[in-house]
Structure formats: structure tokens, C-alpha cells
Amino acid sequence: MRASRFLFATLRETPNDAEVISHQLMLRAGMIRKLASGLYTWLPMGTRVLKKVDAIVREEMNRSGAMEVFMPVTQPASLWEESGRYEQYGPELLRFKDRHDNPFVLGPTHEEVITDLARNELKSYKQLPVNFYQIQTKFRDEIRPRFGVMRSREFIMKDAYSFHATQESLQETYDVMYDTYSRIFTRLGLDFRPVQADTGSIGGSASHEFHVLAASGEDDIAFSTESDYAANVEMAEAVLVGERAAPTQEFKLVETPNQKTIADVCQFLNADPKQSVKALLVQGVADEKGNVPVVALFLRGDHELNEIKAEKHPLVAAPLAFATEEQLQAFGLTAGFTGPQGLVEKGITVIVDRAASVLSDFVAGANEADKHAVGVNWERDAQITEVFDLRNVVEGDPSPDGKGTLQIKRGIEVGHIFQLGTKYSEALGCKVLGEDGKPFTVTMGCYGIGVTRVVAAAIEQNYDDKGIIWPQAIAPFEIAIVPMNAHKSPRTLEAAEALYAELQAQGFDVLLDDRNERPGVKFSDLELMGIPHRIVIGEKGLDAGTFEYKGRRDAEASNLTKEELLAKLAR
């Protein structure tokens, strides 16, 4: 591509509404332009990157044996009513009617459509397993679109859906897709982690997310220093460490006027928050008569409750809800001053986090306003109904696989795979005939990659103060050739044209910057755009038989012979 025939839409200033670095650089590098809130036009520079991501994803999906389809963005609302998600999905689902007053939705995902396809086209177990995928536009009516294409309303996804006769067959395809995703993100040049994840609103049994590690990520990822273990913090198990020591202190109550938070209480008492417990009084599962019990959750003072873990306890109501003031009054409890003493005797279930369960001589609420208890010990002073993993892991915790300790970094979710089971096939009646001639409900998996989000995530991981530093596989151009003063020097232009043709013939994606611009402008644009290799051709270099080469990550340029240059580019 000749730069004189290409749209350079670079900006020198950062737009005020661009918060994260990827949004800033995508605008400045001329990759995207905002059309409306959460809607972006992809310019030629951005489209080139997008198509390269698209190509790698498509190659690996085809390699996995999946078959490409293409489904409508517009979907009949009746399918979503069948699945039960028409109301459940909430305001992110854009609903509208056509001129005939038929209700439709703009698809945020395609489980319903693909299941409808499968129930009409798949008739026998002999057709299973099968895996369909598409690369298609989605629309989610985000209440606050932000971060550019990272959280936009319209975006491109690769979504795949597999259909199986057995759970074992689903597991096999799930493992294939796990490996396929790992190959995709490796080829994209990203530092990523596959992590155990919650299944969320889509539902199902097993789930893994693929996260690109970046400081701007919205999710906390816990991973081992010595193994491949990685999990979303909401899913990472907090391992029990140590044993409870014997009591050494007497139990007593102390006045703590107006000291309600753990930090305030511990500072007032000159105590370590690690030697305190805090209570969270929540609603339990209602009994047959509709009575809702109170459940007391106790954690170490310096730890945070993991709501997802708490909701998985069979005695805790989901979604998690705090006990009402009326419920607290019925047991004579005061918010902010609740301790475990006497709760079991009052009929309250006391669930204690693992780390809190091994404390002795700790600080707790006194179950009286403006008082706390010190020297509290389990069994002697307070009873435990059950010990349960309730907290978020923290950096330095032992890895659950027994290898190393946990590090915690921010991650950007770019892929997600689920074992859906029969959630959608059951709801939409997707059945095939088995070996015995009887119909059975198929089991499903689904596998998504945010194609547009991958582009932004790659930038969040690869940039400096000059601009983007693309991994070569997805750079808009791999090589930029800059002939110095080409409009005045036919010799440099001729040499540049010859090298341009030679590198293109070798399969490189090359930009010949033949614009009538100052060298400084060209260099700034090329660094901003993140092109991995820059070759400058000048009169002095031609006289010496060398080319000036600079890799995008290099601090300094170097003069190379043509043979050295070609060897460098071939690596």
C-alpha cells in the first residue's frame, strides 16, 4: 500500500472523552471514529487490524473442525420468549417491532437462533457432535458505553455453539475449544491467562474465561507463581492455612463509642484487623411457610466477602440480600456491633470463613451498641454452625493447586467458553433420535471471542508514550519504508520502490510512505500507528550500501546491509 493513496487520519491531540489508553490511541492513530454513544466507524487503519484478528480466529476455528454459518442480527422475539430470556435479559436487549407489528430483538448473542437452527436441521444422533460458528455483529444497549470499543453497544464477536449426545462428547469439544482459544491468543501475540470462571447469566456448568493481562482490566485474576493455575478472583478457592491456637486471653467487653468499621475499631483498640472478625447478616433460604431466617457470615477483619461464594451455600438466599432491620431487632442485634457470641443459641446459622475459623483471642462485636468483645475464642465463647470458603483471595495466598502462591493482576476478558448443558435445548425443544429410535434432548456448549475487544486489549498491553506497539501478526502493516526526500531524489524513490516490490513478493504487508511530508511527521505517524518495522532509505545509506532499520520497540536505529535487513525481517 502506498501512503499517498491511504487515509491517514492521525490526530496530534487526545480527545477529551477518551478515558483508557486504547480508546485514546485508536482515535489518534486514525483507527476509529465515534458515530454515536457506543457506536464506532472503523477507518481503513483499524479495519486492517480487525481483519487480521478475524483471519486468525477463522483459521483456528476451521482447523478445530467447526463449521462457519452466518445468522441474522435481527431475531424474532418469540425465540427469546421460548427460552425465557425475553424479560430476564433486561434493558440491554433492544426490542422493537416491524411495520407489521411483529416483535423483534437486536441480538446480543445467538443461543436462541442457533438452537432453532439445530432443532430444525439435526434429526439423528449420527449428526452429532457438531460445532457451528460465526463472526457477526452484536448489539447490547449498555446503559453507559465507555472505553471506546472495549465496552461499546455494537461490537463484533466470534460465537460458536456445539451440540452433543453426551456430556463426555461435550467435554471433548470443550477441551478442543480451550486449546483452540489458547492457539488463537498465542498467535495474536497476547499475554493471556485462561481462568476458571462463574457461568453468569448465560448459565451452564463449567466455564473458562480468557483474559489479557493489563492494568486497565475490569476483572481481578488470581494466578500461581509456579503453575498454570489461574482463576477469576470470584472463583479462586481460599485455602485454609494454619491451625487454631489455644486461648491465652480472657473474654471481656470494652466500650467502643461510635466505632463501627473494622478500621476504626482496631485503631481505637490498638488491634490488628487480622485478629478481628466482622459479621455480615444476610437472608437465608425461606422455609415451606415462607419464613426467611437470618444467616450470620463471619470473616476476618481484613478480608472481603465473595458474594458468589456466599450465594453457593445452600442455606444462603440468592441473590445475596442483607437482613432487614426488623429481622435484626427480632434477635436483639445491632448492625455494626454483631459478634458470634450466643448467635447459634438464638437459632441463627453461623457460617465462618476458613481464615476466620482458625483465629483465637480475636476482636468481635459485643451484640450491644458501642461495645466490642476482646479475647474472643471459638467454642469457648462462640459456636460455629459451619466453616465455609466465603472470601476473596488476596495476593500471597497459597495457590489452591498446592504450587506456589497467588499473584493478582487485572485482566480484560476477550474470550469465554461454557458448558451450557441442556438449558437452551430443553427450553426450545431441540431433540434428535438416539440409537434406540427415541428422541432425546441434546446437550450444548458455547464459545465466544470479542473480536473488536481483542484489538483494544492488544493496545492496552502494547504501547508506549509514542503510540501503539502492535504484535506483528495483527499490525495494520508489518513494515514501513520511508524514502527520504523522495520528491527530490529519484534515486531514493527508485530504491524504495524496488525494496517495496521485493518485500511484497516475499509476503510481507508493506506500507511505502511516499507522502510529501517532513520526515518527522512521517516518523511520528508510523510510531503512533505501531508498525513493527521501519526502514529509512536515504542518499548516504545508498552510497554506503545500507538501510536504516528501527524496530518499534528499539531505542535506537541501526544501519544494515540488505542481507542483514532481510535476515532481521525474516525472524
Swiss-Prot record:
It is found in: Cytoplasm. Transmembrane segments: none annotated. Belongs to the class-II aminoacyl-tRNA synthetase family. ProS type 1 subfamily. It is an enzyme of class 6 (ligase). One of its GO terms (molecular function) is ATP binding. GO terms for cellular component: cytosol. Homodimer. Pfam families: HGTP_anticodon (PF03129), tRNA-synt_2b (PF00587), tRNA_edit (PF04073). HAMAP family: Pro_tRNA_synth_type1. It comes from the Bacteria. This is Proline--tRNA ligase. PROSITE patterns: AA_TRNA_LIGASE_II (PS50862). The keyword Nucleotide-binding applies.
